[in-house]
Structures are given as C-alpha cells and as structure tokens.
Amino acid sequence: MAYRSCVVGFSSHSGCEVTPAGSSQPGTSGWGSCGLPGPGFSSRSLTSCRPAGVIPKVTVNPSLLVPLDLKVDPAVQQQKNQEKEEMKVLNDKFASLIGKVQALEQRNQLLETRWGFLQGQGSATFDLSHHYETFQGRLQEELRKVSQERGQLEASLLQVLEKVEEFRVRYEDEISKRTDLEFTFVQLKKDLDAECLRRTELETKLKGLQGFVELMRTVYEQELKDLTAQVKDVSVTVGLDSRCHIDLSGIVEEVKAQYDAIAARSLEEAEAYSRSQLEERAARSAEFGNSLQSSRCEIADLNVRIQKLRSQIVSVKSHCLKLEENIKVAEEQGELAFQDAKDKMAQLEAALQKAKQDMARQLREYQDLMNTKLALDIEIATYHKLMEGEESRMDLPSTTVVSAVQSRCRTTASKSGLSKTPSRKKKNRGGPVIKITEMSEKYLSQESEASE
C-alpha cells in the first residue's frame, strides 16, 4: 500500500512524498517535490500535487514490472488514520489562528477608528477647564446674588428693627402717658366722689335748713297766733293815768314786723346760702363732669391707639419672624447650593480622573494591541515571504531520478509506477506544520488488481 504525505507549513521547505506500504527505507527517486501554499496565499488545493516541471524519460527494467502479491499492512492504515487525525487537529488549530488573526485585525481597525475619534475629540475631552471656569463663574454669580440678597435682607431687617425700636419707645411713652392719665383719672374720680359726697351733705344740710326754716316759720306763726289770741282774749283792766295813752296795737304791729323781717331775712340768707352752695357745687360738678368726659374720651383714644400699636407690633413681629425665616432659608439654600457645587465639582473631578484613567488604560490596551498587531504583521509578512520563496522554488523545473533497487518493496514501488522523495520537515519558529497524507489512486487500483 502506498500513500502520499505532503508537509505544508510556514517554513522555507514544503514537500509531498510517496511511500510504498511495508517499505522500511525511503526511496531516492519519486515524482518530485510539490509545494502546497499556505491558506490565504494561493488558490491551489491542499490535497493537489502538481508535477514540478517536465519529467524526463525513464528507463525501467521489465523484470521489475512483474506483479507481486501485496497485502495491506495494518500498521500503515493505523498510521494513516493517526496522521489524518493529526491533520484535522492541525487544520483546526490553523483555522482558529486565522480566525484570531481576523479578529485581531478587526479589533485593530476598531481601535484605530476609536483612536482617530479620540484624537479628534482629544481637545474637547481634556479641555475641561473652560467648563470648570464657566461653572465656577456661575456659582460665584449665584453666591454674589445670594450675598446681595443677604445684604438687602440685613438692611431691611435693620430698618425693621429700628422701626420696632421706635414703636417700642412710642409704646412705652404711650404706656407711661396712659399710666399718668389713669392716675389723674383716679385722682379726679376721688375728687369727684368727694365732691359728690359734699354735694350730698350740702343737699342734706339744705334740706335740714329748709325744714328748720319751715319749722321756725311754723313756730313763729303759731306763737304769733297764740300771742294774738292772748291779746284778744285777755282783758286787762289797767288803771292808767288818763293823761297817758299807750298804743298796744302799734307795739304788736311793730314786734310782728320785726319778727317778719327777721324771718324773711333768715329765709333769704338761708336761700341765698343754699343757692350759692348749689351753684358752686353745680359749677364744680359740671367742671368735674367735663373733665371726666374729656378723660373718658382721652382714655378711649388711648385705648384705640394702644390697640393700633399692639396690632402694628404684632404685624412687625410677624414680619420680623418672616424675614428671619427668609434669611435662614436663604442661608440654607446658599449652603446647599455651595455644597451641591462642591459635590458637582468633586464628581466632575472624579469623572475627569476616571476618564483620564480610562484613557490611559485604553492607550495601554491600544499600545499592547499595536504591539501585537506589529508582531503579527511581521510574522505574517515573514510567512508570506517564505511562501512566496517556496512557490518560486516550486515553480523551477526538477529532475527525476529512478534507480533500480534490489529490495522487494522498491521493486513493487517501481512496478506500481510510484516513487517517493524523502519527506522534508523543517521546524519553523512559531509556525504550525501540517502533514497531509493521501492514498494513491493508482496504487489502490493496482492493489485491487493484485487481489483479484
């Protein structure tokens, strides 16, 4: 049984050899070496082996063309299967390497695109000072506005406090005036009560005097009546001198006139005194009533003014409380805005630091990928040059030398029209070696004829 093994790889030598079954020594003649290009570098099949150049005429001994009884060696079949498995594994590895190379090329293109984009946006990405300055200016403007509002609020608060102090002074003055007026009112009330008591006493005295006058008048009239009756009823026998005449009626009239004059004068004096006292008390009462009315009016006015001042004080206090609350709210808002600005600035700095770290990491990754790409490009270029050199070497004409061999295996190989060349395997640094083994169709046909 004969098989052909082809060694394909990224090396400077590639060959295809034909080995007869059961042979232990490699032949020195064959079809010639055939080169198999690496994947992606040529359109020729991996399983094809074209003749190298023009084959010269070969002279063969006819005795060597006698068919032999050949049998298939199981070791060769096992070796062939093993080599096929190795070929599959190596082909899979080669395909995975090609996929990795393509993925790296795509990633390289993606990184180049990203690098170009980042270079295009480099100035916009790293030039954040303008944004910081704008944001800081806006915060300073807000802080300035808050400071102005705080100054205005403090000025208005001072004005309100001055007004409150003024109202407090006025309120204290009004309170002192009210206290004085209340004291005056109490004094006037006391005087009025005293005068009322005196008036009552005088009225009582007047009534007593009037009763006394009436009593005296009644007594006088009764005495006068009694005296008149006595005078009329008493008959006096007086021995008088006829020469002396006494006018008793005149005397009685005179006494009566005196009594009447005394009673009238007493009555007039009592009436005049009572009238004067009453007029005086009435004048004083009217004066006290007027002062009391004026005091009541003043007290009512003071009460109204006090109520107004109290309402104004309450409104001013509420306004002061509102202003204090507004100041506190403004301070809290300013502190919150300042803290928020600090937090945002810290976040921006953290984002900038993170962006710088990401950029540095991407640059390191890009540098690593560029190094990997450069190494792969160098390796691919080397493999490409090696394959081009191998293809150029394979395109040159080769000579075939056939010699007769005494061994049975070589005779069988010459009868079957097959020869082989020593398999050339050259280790390549970093490149996989793929060995392809195929059955010779011609040898299989001869083997079938021999079995028949």
Curated annotation (Swiss-Prot):
Keyword Transmembrane helix listed: no
Modified residues (Phosphoserine): S45
Residue span of region Coil 1A: 82-118
Disordered: region residues: 411-452
Top-rank taxon, per record: Eukaryota
Gene3D superfamilies: 1.20.5.170, Single helix bin (1.20.5.500), Vasodilator-stimulated phosphoprotein (1.20.5.1160)
SMART domains, per database record: Filament (SM01391)
Region (Linker 12): 228-251
A cellular component term, taken from the record's GO annotations: keratin filament
Site features described as Stutter, chain residue numbers: G334
Positions with biased composition (Polar residues): 411-421, 443-452
Region ranges (Head): 1-82
Keyword terms: Coiled coil, Intermediate filament, Keratin, Phosphoprotein
Residue numbers spanned by region Tail: 391-452
Pfam families: Filament, Keratin_2_head
Family to which the UniProt record says this protein belongs: Belongs to the intermediate filament family.
Matches recorded under PANTHER family: GATA-TYPE DOMAIN-CONTAINING PROTEIN, KERATIN, TYPE II CYTOSKELETAL 80
Identification of the protein by name: Keratin, type II cytoskeletal 80
Organism: Rattus norvegicus (Rat)
Gene assigned in the entry: Krt80
